[in-house]
């Protein structure tokens, strides 16, 4: 008997061996990502047609040492290729692997191709042609170190191509992988199966094919073994006909129920189309549904919930996924007691959010991505109701409810779309939570070193889940950021090209925010009362805004009736943002000027006079674009002395900064001919009342005679 290699994904070797034994193979031997065996041709045909897990079957012609390209050529030349196929058949060589001497797979494929063609030429036969697109035959060469395996790929395009899926949903699973997940999920034909995040339906379709005993290759039209000289059409026709009859009968006998849900109606339609092409459309009910709100179907006793939920590469950038897994886990416990669940993901942190202990788990890559499949037993009804009624982080949740009741009412009254809901009120939940219209930003402060990663992750997931439950925000509208002390060049670091800009309202003024591109959003929430005050003071005045950021104070001044405005910042990005803010409020014209400049240098040589000046400098700056460093405690008098020169006699400077324990040098200020009034308390909005040191704010005027 001839020797064969069945190829599969790493981690599925045992499962494949069991499948091959069921198909008639005796004495299979496990190898890396595959199984070798010897079998008669009818068993091989049956394996090709019926295997749900193998991606390819290789007829092994030779195994030989390959130290260099000469060994490769001689090893391939030793095979009498004309005995296996005729010259009218087209072929391609698939070369997998490299070693120290053969470092390029294309070069290796070329040497094997040369050896094959030369054997035909030496036998005075025509050369077979190469066809990379649609070859009759695929020659398979696998190189591992100095060991080579050479043979025919009996399949052609991989066995995962069942013929029913012409388009897929998000991040589709290969059919062979999906079949393996089903086989390891605790499901069998006697149990109903539900996929709450079904995408294009692959898991359910593969399970339905198993239930009705439909061969996965029954709809396949082309097989490379048909081009080999020893192909036995009678045996193959009999095996395929038997499979077709079995499939037709099987569909009629199945009484197992399959359910698929997805939030995207377009993907659901794709799943229905795929099921129709697979011939199992009558067995599966597909519908639009949210996995976090999914209800147990009637008659779903002892059923299995299986899914491949989305998973991000980095937990810190995917708060919506934390909320999704957390809420999905809660829904499983509440709705599916007595059932089992099988979940496949690459992210253990996300799987931990489900809050169930796995009975079994299997490591299994999705392509090159390491993943794990975990099987869970869901407790019966009494226990699950108790689990469902337990509040997530009750102390944190209660504080959030209290804050939302108080601050939400205040924000609506003040016509504020944005406010701080929570600001590290509880030491165990060290984060700031901001509301931006229909979005929530959770800004997690870096955990102390003595807090373990597991505990920090648990608290973070609790915060996200509790925030979603209390506020009712859509999980996709939750944004997570890790906040650290920012200085100089990384204060306005760009995060990603997601460009989520939208308008928010603040005391009747529209301002543009961006929640994801930068560490900050374009709007400092603690200054909302300061900006309102500037708007109230600005009527008929010439206004100057220094270190202007996105110009929100300028917008308030302009909307408050300022005669003119000058907005200065060193960043072109933020100046353009400021202009857009002004345009959004119909504040246009030459009376509104924008200047890109280093504010410190500009002040030293600037001319002109202003009635109202707002300056909110950084606490410290060492930007490469500034010639000197700046420290607000050290340099504030110098700053104010320069401003005095530009301030009209009855004018006002609103001076603010965020340095904790800032001390105004009133003696030096007096010598400079200026006087100061601390208005920090008056400019502290209700949502920042718990953080009295978030900023300090001063009214600076010329000293009265």
Swiss-Prot record:
Function field: Specifically methylates the guanine in position 2445 (m2G2445) and the guanine in position 2069 (m7G2069) of 23S rRNA.
UniProt-recorded name of the protein: Ribosomal RNA large subunit methyltransferase K/L
InterPro entries: 23SrRNA_methyltr_KL, DNA_methylase_N6_adenine_CS, RlmKL-like_Mtase, RlmKL-like_Mtase_CS, RlmL_1st, SAM-dep_methyl-trfase, SAM-dependent_MTases_sf, THUMP_dom
Any GO MF annotation of the entry: 23S rRNA (guanine(2445)-N(2))-methyltransferase activity
Chief place of localization: cytoplasm
Keywords: Cytoplasm, Methyltransferase, RNA-binding, rRNA processing, S-adenosyl-L-methionine, Transferase
THUMP domain mapped to chain residues: 43-154
Keyword Transport: no
Pfam families for the chain: Methyltrans_SAM, RlmL_1st, THUMP, UPF0020
Catalysed reactions, as listed in the record: guanosine(2445) in 23S rRNA + S-adenosyl-L-methionine = N(2)-methylguanosine(2445) in 23S rRNA + S-adenosyl-L-homocysteine + H(+); guanosine(2069) in 23S rRNA + S-adenosyl-L-methionine = N(2)-methylguanosine(2069) in 23S rRNA + S-adenosyl-L-homocysteine + H(+)
EC numbers for this chain: 2.1.1.173, 2.1.1.264
Top enzyme class: transferase
